[in-house]
């Protein structure tokens, strides 16, 4: 099945490059291009793509606000969003994830990781660039540690294994290969971890793993 994508970036050359990269993959179809946040919001609401690929810093509305309006907790029928940017500041990463983004990549991530993130988002999964996850954990380590939240129920042995790999920035597919289990099994474990830990995304799972010295 073809994954329909809207690409939003205010830099014409960058946007054209992203469209060209995605156009090389038969399973992906770019159905719209936006040069600012207002246009991105309008196109996404009208075209209902499978994935919105959006830059953080754009005129009109920034990528975080666009994400919040199409994928936030108050949205009844959210769109999958992957945020891509040259700015790797922690507030952008956390802001995007809290707004509902399913992926966060830096623009130097490379085509393969970009396509993986789009496929993951369309499948209801999430992919955060491993270098972003590692840096977030390093930043997290610098603050005064808080008492970690106790899980609602004890984690199973398999959930503990998945927890550590998520904290390393691994995708569900990579975890499935490492543990010799199906992709759906990994997704179930990640969903269970989020429920038990009260985590909203994979970064919060990773932060909990760090706080409890799992990694």
Language-model features, listed with the residues they occupy:
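The feature encodes the CheY-like receiver
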Residues: 14, 54, 59
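Recognition helix of helix-turn-helix DNA-binding domains
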Residues: 169-204
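Short, flexible helix-to-coil linker/hinge segments that flank and couple to helix-turn-helix
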Residues: 92-98, 102-103, 107-157, 161, ...
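Active-site residues of response regulator receiver
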Residues: 9, 55, 85
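Acidic catalytic/metal-coordinating carboxylates
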Residues: 36-39, 59-68
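Short hydrophobic/Thr-rich beta-strand motif most characteristic of the beta2 strand and flanking loop
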Residues: 27-35, 43, 199
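Active-site beta3 strand of CheY-like receiver
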Residues: 47-53
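Conserved acidic segment of CheY-like receiver
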Residues: 2-14, 18-22, 155
């Amino acid at each position: 099945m073809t994954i329909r994508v809207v690409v939003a970036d205010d830099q014409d050359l960058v946007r054209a490059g992203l469209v060209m990269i995605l156009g090389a993959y038969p399973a992906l179809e770019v159905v719209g291009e936006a040069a600012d946040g207002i246009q991105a919001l309008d196109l996404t609401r009208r075209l209902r793509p499978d994935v919105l690929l959006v830059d953080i810093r754009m005129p009109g509305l920034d990528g975080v606000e666009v994400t919040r309006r199409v994928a936030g907790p108050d949205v009844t029928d959210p769109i999958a969003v992957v945020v891509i940017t040259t700015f790797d500041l922690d507030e952008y990463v956390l802001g995007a994830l809290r707004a509902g983004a399913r992926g966060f990549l830096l623009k130097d991530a490379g085509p393969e990781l970009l396509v993986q993130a789009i496929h993951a988002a369309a499948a209801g999964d999430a992919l955060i660039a491993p270098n972003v996850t590692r840096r977030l954990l390093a930043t997290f380590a610098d603050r005064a540690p808080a008492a970690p939240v106790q899980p609602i129920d004890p984690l199973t042995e398999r959930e503990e294994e998945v927890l550590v790999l998520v904290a390393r920035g691994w995708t569900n597919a990579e975890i499935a290969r490492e543990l010799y289990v199906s992709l759906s099994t990994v997704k179930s474990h990640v969903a269970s971890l989020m429920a038990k830990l009260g985590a909203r995304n994979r970064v919060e799972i990773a932060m909990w793993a760090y706080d409890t010295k799992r990694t």
